[in-house]
Amino acid sequence: MAPIFRSTSLIAFSLFFFFFASTLPISSGSEDSYTITGRVRVPASTVIGHAAKFSNIKVILNGGQHVTFLRPDGYFTFHKVPAGTHLIEVYALGYFFSPVRVDVSARHRGKVQATLTETRRSLTELVLEPLRAEQYYEMREPFSVMSIVKSPMGLMVGFMVVVVFLMPKLMENIDPEEMKSAQEQMRSQGVPSLTSLLPASR
């Protein structure tokens, strides 16, 4: 009697377990992931006297969630990227790259659409090029005579040259009576006469 009761209880427990398990939602435990492959194209010109090397260029996904470097041919790859919207950033010495918004479609089996965030331009291929070159050092301006003339010291020297050489000639054309009356007015007001400052008036 006891074995029959045990077998009956075991069968009832098994049926209950299978029935309860069938009512739970089934999850695969992992999302569908995709691979993003792109290329970084850098001009052949040098930056700050050094050629840009692919090994020094870093590509970042979602602010550091994934980081990769370029292969010698300039390509990069991100593996196990879930469907959704992602952000790709390129860090290269001497260049500024626009961040790229990448939309990975789950409906179309990993179809990728890329858009530059700076210019809002869509990319048919994930080929990233710098928007501009960056200068980290201020370039020294070449020597220029005009820069010296326009400086405060140059303007002061020019004014002194006018006073010393041109003012005496201008004074010669002024009526002596008018000059005398002007000097008297300046003395009465406590202002020194301009002619007293000139070598010709001494």
Swiss-Prot record:
Where does the secretion signal sit in this chain? 1-23
GO molecular-function terms, A-Z: carbohydrate binding
Membrane-topology descriptor: Single-pass membrane protein
Transmembrane domains' residue ranges: 148-168
Q: Which of UniProt's keywords are assigned here?
A: Membrane, Signal, Transmembrane, Transmembrane helix
Tell me where in or outside the cell this protein is found: Membrane
| Pfam family membership, one | EMC7_beta-sandw
Q: Where is the composition biased (Polar residues)?
A: 182-202
Fetch the InterPro entries from UniProt. Carb-bd-like_fold, EMC7, EMC7_beta_sandwich
Location of region: Disordered: 179-202
Q: Which domain of life is it from?
A: Eukaryota
Query: What GO terms fall under cellular component here?
Result: endoplasmic reticulum; plasma membrane
- Family affiliation: Belongs to the EMC7 family.
Recorded protein name is ER membrane protein complex subunit 7 homolog
Task: Please give the organism.
Answer: Arabidopsis thaliana
